[in-house]
Amino acid sequence: LPERDRRARLSLRRPARASRRFHPGPALPQKRGAGYARSRQVYSGQNRPRHRRRGIYRQRALPPGPHAGLQKAHCARFHENGLFEINEELKPRFGSDRYQIVLASIRDRERLESVFEDYRPDIVFHAAAHKHVPMMEINPCEAVKNNVFGTKNVLECCIAYKVKRCILISTDKAVNTTNVMGATKRVAELLVQSLNGHGCEFAAVRFGNVLGSNGSVVHTFQRQIDQGGPVTVTHRDITRYFMTIPEAVSLVLSAGALAKGGEIFVLDMGSPVKIYDLATDMIRLSGYEPGRDIKIEITGLRPGEKCFEELVQADESIDTTSHEKIFVMKSEPVNSSLVLDSVYSLHQVLEQDDEQAVRTALFSLVQRDMHRKTAE
């Protein structure tokens, strides 16, 4: 609490103790804006050798996508402004002869084929996606163009250029989705399963929010705190799963090593975090008292937003793997012909440039039973 010197009219604040409501490890660091991540020791001991299995270690990798936090840890942020910055970070650490930065769009099939032709990757980590839920709600055509048909371009290039393995970075928002972004990622998962078995091992990794990535709630809250508030939360009871950037990268690489083709992996995300509690903790970590120094404002759920996210659908179950933090989905195999025909129909609707029609076709696709038993 503030201690006031009445004569000098100064306010002194003691740093608040880190709350452990969402942080099971050591106290959260006091660094402004970037230090609110859990420490789960994912790089210690037994996790490292897992990346060396089944051809992951020392392979030529192509990680397309602007998934800023995750991609920066993998290799680079693939958008124009970030390319220069990440190149400056990588050069002194690795030397410019160990990597190559390429500017390209996954929607540009000709350019994408040129990149695959030039670099002949052994493994692809596909993280390219438009990922902001409210933005995609008002831009459904762009979401489908990028997240569905951009993904289709990547997968087909993997087959054409004999890539050994391709890992799609998916999201828990693909489960029982109520928003455009999640629906497009669910279609991407179906494409991964449908195109598997054509010479490339395709798999997907599904997880929640990445703490510290660009555009994350942590950055938003810190900016609002720096501005004096209010800190905005859409619902008092809203929860989300969170993972640190190093943890996410480690587990994605490990899942890639486990992949044999056709799997959807689910990561151990721990317990869901109440966003209101996260806001309260961050305010206190900044040396303020919630509700008095910095107010928390409940703004209401945004279009497409759910109060809680799920990791599996009703017709799915999970099984363990050799990695204690990685699980694999168990469900009926998909009907590949049905999926590809449905995606083709979606493309025909997309060409009409009718946003409502695209939205309707998209949700009709993800709500349809795409398993082989449908055709039996």
Residue ranges and their predicted role:
Residues 1-47, 159:
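Flexible, Lys/Arg-rich cytosolic regulatory linkers and terminal tails that connect or flank
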Residues 70-71, 116-125, 133, 163:
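Proline-aspartate-enriched helix->loop->beta-strand connector
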Residues 9-13, 126, 130-186, 194-195:
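Conserved Rossmann-fold NAD(P)-dependent oxidoreductase catalytic core, especially the SDR/UDP-sugar
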Residues 33, 37-42, 154, 189-210, ...:
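Strand-loop microenvironment adjacent to phosphate/nucleotide-handling motifs in alpha/beta enzyme folds
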